């Protein structure tokens, strides 16, 4: 099997298992935030020792930062959950990171809308 294809399969499986584990974890701190947390993508290193988990949060930047800190705090739970449900030689160490890609794309779309409105106003005059 192509190693790149295998890594993609592992990344998708880990992403799904973290999302699943997020729903199963019973921690009051996370319970309040988990309906707003989105695991947007996972990147596994070539040696499969590390997995960078990118987290988006539907809300403000401070809440997103808090969500990433909480996930980092409970990463042992998620790693154990992955180890129990994924047949792989070693379970990668999880590193949770903020994913600002969604917010950036929204910001860019707003800027493009403003530009098109300005161009329309100029052409109307």
From Swiss-Prot:
Q: Which Gene3D superfamilies match?
A: 3.30.300.20
What keyword terms does UniProt attach to this protein? Cytoplasm, Ribosome biogenesis
GO cellular component terms listed in the entry, alphabetical order? cytosol
Q: Which PANTHER family match?
A: RIBOSOME-BINDING FACTOR A, CHLOROPLASTIC-RELATED
The record's subunit annotation is: Monomer. Binds 30S ribosomal subunits, but not 50S ribosomal subunits or 70S ribosomes.
The UniProt gene name for this protein comes to rbfA
The record's comment on protein family reads: Belongs to the RbfA family.
Name-wise, this protein is Ribosome-binding factor A
* GO molecular function terms attached to this record: ribosomal small subunit binding
Q: Which compartments does it reside in?
A: Cytoplasm
Free-text function comment from the UniProt entry: One of several proteins that assist in the late maturation steps of the functional core of the 30S ribosomal subunit. Associates with free 30S ribosomal subunits (but not with 30S subunits that are part of 70S ribosomes or polysomes). Required for efficient processing of 16S rRNA. May interact with the 5'-terminal helix region of 16S rRNA.
Instruction: Name its GO BP terms in alphabetical order.
Output: maturation of SSU-rRNA
Query: Which InterPro entries is this protein grouped with?
Result: KH_dom-like_a/b, RbfA, RbfA_dom_sf, Ribosome-bd_factorA_CS
């Amino acid at each position: 099997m192509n190693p790149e294809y295998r890594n993609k399969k592992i990344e998708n499986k880990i992403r799904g298992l973290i999302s699943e584990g997020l729903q199963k974890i019973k921690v009051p701190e996370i319970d309040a935030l988990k309906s707003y947390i989105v695991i947007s993508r996972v990147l596994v290193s070539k040696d499969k020792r590390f997995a960078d988990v990118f987290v988006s949060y539907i809300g403000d930047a401070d809440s997103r930062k808090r969500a990433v800190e909480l996930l980092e705090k409970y990463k042992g739970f998620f790693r154990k959950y992955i180890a129990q449900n994924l047949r792989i030689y070693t379970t990668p160490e999880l590193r949770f990171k903020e994913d600002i890609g969604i917010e950036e794309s929204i910001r860019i779309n707003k800027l493009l809308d403003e530009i098109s409105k300005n161009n329309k106003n100029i052409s109307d005059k």
